[in-house]
Structure formats: C-alpha cells, structure tokens
Amino acid sequence: MKKIVSGVLFSLFVLPVFALYNSFGVPDSSEIRKELVESWFEAPLQNVRMNRPEIRTNSVGQKFQIRMEETEDSFNIFVAPYARIEVDVYSDKGKTTEVQDIYPGDAPGSWLLVRDKKSGKPLRIRYYFAADSEVFVQFLPSGKTALCDYLIFGCYAAKGVPTGLPFGRFYSSSFDQVVRWTENSLPWQYMQIHPDDYHAVQQMANVLKERNPDVILVDDAMYDDEGKPVYISSGKPRKNGELEEGKISVSGAGYLKWIADGIIEPLAGARLKRDPLLEPTVEYKKTGFQGILSEKYAISFSLDWVRNLASGVISVRTGRNYLYKDSGVDVTIEPFCAELTEKGIRNSFGYIENSGYSVKMLKPLLYVLAAQNPQLFYFGAIRETDRRSPEVKIFNECCAFFPYFDSQKRFKCEVFKDGSQMSFEEFFSRYCIDSVLLVKLHAAEEFYPAD
C-alpha cells in the first residue's frame, strides 16, 4: 500500500509535550548549549559540516535537536526543542491523521546562531519564545559587547539596545537570564498574555459571524436612533424597494453603526443619532490640496464616522456627553522604532495625525494593542490612495478589527467589513498601500445587534 504524506502541514497545532522548565514555560537548552561552543558555535564551517544532527536531553527530560542549515551567505546552527505535529496522510484506503515528531527551528524554546559563511564570524543569536514565530529577541555583536533587538512581525519594538554583556555570554544563557538582564530595557510586557482575558472580544466576533448572513449591503444605508431605515447622506426614509424583510440592509458605515448600536442599546434602550456622527473631526487648510478637495468632496467621511461612533459609545457607557475632541478614542501609540523591509531596515513612520498608520504596520500594531488592552476592539477608517491620482487620498471605507490571543497564545485578528468577515491577509492584500486610522472601543459581553 502506497502512502502519500501531504507536503503541507495541514494542522499547525503543535502538541504541548514539553515539561515546563522556567517561569515562562519556554523549553530551555542552556545547559546543552554549554557543551556545543567548541564543536558547533566556534568551529570552522568545514568542521561544522561534518557534524551530524544530534539529539540531546536536558536535566528535566526535554529533548533538543542540534543541526546546521546553510544559506547563500551564512550558515545557521539550530538548537530546537522537540514537538509533535498532526499531518494528513493519504493512501488508497483514504485519509488518516498521524502525529509526527519534529524539531521546529522557530518554536518557543528554539535558539539560533547565524554565522557568516566566508569568515565564520557570528552575526546574531536569536531566542524564540512566543507562539508566533515572527516575535523574538536577537543579539548582535558590537565590539566587545552585544546589542539587542525585539521584533514583532518585522517591526522593531526595540533596536540596538546595549546589554553591556559579551556576545559569547549568550551561547549558554537561558531565556530566564535574558529576561532578567533586559527587564528594564526591552518591552517584555508584550509577552504577558492571558487568553481568558479576550472573552468579550471573541464573543462579539462570534456574534457577528452568526449575524452576518442577515446583512445585505446597500449604498448610503443605515438605521437611525429609532431603528428606522434612512439614508446616511440625507436622513430621509429609505424606499421600500431597498428593504428586504428579515434582512439588515446597511452600507459599510451603516454596518459599523449597527455594531455600535448593539453595544449601547442593551445599556440605554436607544441607538445613536445620525447627525452627530457626521460632525467634522478634522479641518484642512483651505489653500492646500486636501482643503481644496474637501470643498467639493467628503474626503474625511469614514474618519469622522468612526471617531464619532466611538465617542458616542463612550458617552453612553460613562453617562457623560463626550465630543470627539475630548473623547481620547484615537489610537496614537508609537511602539516601534524601525521596520524590516525588502530593502533592509528603515525608520518607522508610525502614527500620522488624521491619517493613522500604514496598513503595512497594522499586524504588529494590533499585536501590541491586543497584548496591552485585551478588552478593546477597534473601528478603522481606511484612507485610500487613488490609483490613477496618488495625490488624492480619501477616507471613504471603514471596518472593525477584533484582535486577540487564542488558547495557545497565538495572535489572531478577526476583520469585519461591509457586513462580511474577511481574513487579515485579504485585508492586507487589498489595502497594503493605504493607511488606517484606528479608534478604540470596549468590547461588551452583552452585545445584541438589532434584528
């Protein structure tokens, strides 16, 4: 009988077979690495090539594989922890699922040394500690000491931080030691994640998934504070031909209002009024291009809409009437100093007033926001660039982001737009050259969007 093992790992669920060795639950290879310095970390490339992959066990029974992988310019030495992964196996009898032993080079507890291929000199040491492999710390030699970086999905939360320690110290240092030595210089608060804290965020996202089949997209459509179908642009009643019994007919902006109303109606017995949502929140210079454009077009529609929606929700929750300028709803944090691009490292632009953040920074930004504020979700106003006239930038569309960490502490983000759910990857692909301004809202356990 022939078996075909799928070339793709269909299930990326790594089984938790590690014993907990330190306070962070990260498998620790430090005692093993002490014995590898001469034969793996400092030996010439030709000698390292002669080393066969090794399996070693630490004092608490955790297994690690030591191996070398070559690239065009460097050779990488991995000390990788044991894990098990489910794969689908196809044969003439059908499909079965098998559990296979692996040693992933980027799983929590993995340690990586990168060396230059020509000189053999060390370039960096990387510690993987998060469920998301694109979140890690790395150390780089600088003279007699080492500098440290903390990266989150290609963005530097810290870069070039002096450690005052010789680079060679990290050949045998445990992750616990790394955290202690850098506790005041690296943002370790981003790894203090408690999955149970995201219940309200996940519950709201699940409700929207259940209700989305009832939503149909209609241009310029919303429900007013009395639940009557009206036009956003005029406030006048909509025509019967645009309504469908048993369906929620809204535009993209009306969809976000429907979400906001689902939070406040259980609290106040009412919905948000239309007129305050259209109040301008930004003034453009009349002599500038955007100012001239704003005289003719509503170039800040979705920007004003999401800001005023969030301000309205805060007003109902607190019992105080907040105008946008006093509400503090905008997300303006600057957690990154640089980003890793195809052309190398460049300084991060971060937040731009009344424009928001580049969509390219959105995933690491939402990761940080979720780690810091597990009770929040976000409305986003999308500032699009006209493909034919790049100087024209308009806030016309909007969406909702629900970031959280799952039970395995892996980062997830549910995106809802125009009455439908979309993957973050799809959102990124569609709007990667644009920017998004985020406003924050508290997730509600009692969330009941209207029928």
Predicted regions and their residues:
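Sec-dependent signal peptide recognition
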Residues: 2-10
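Cleavable N-terminal signal peptides
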Residues: 7, 17-18
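Cysteine-nucleophile amide-bond enzymes
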Residues: 19-451
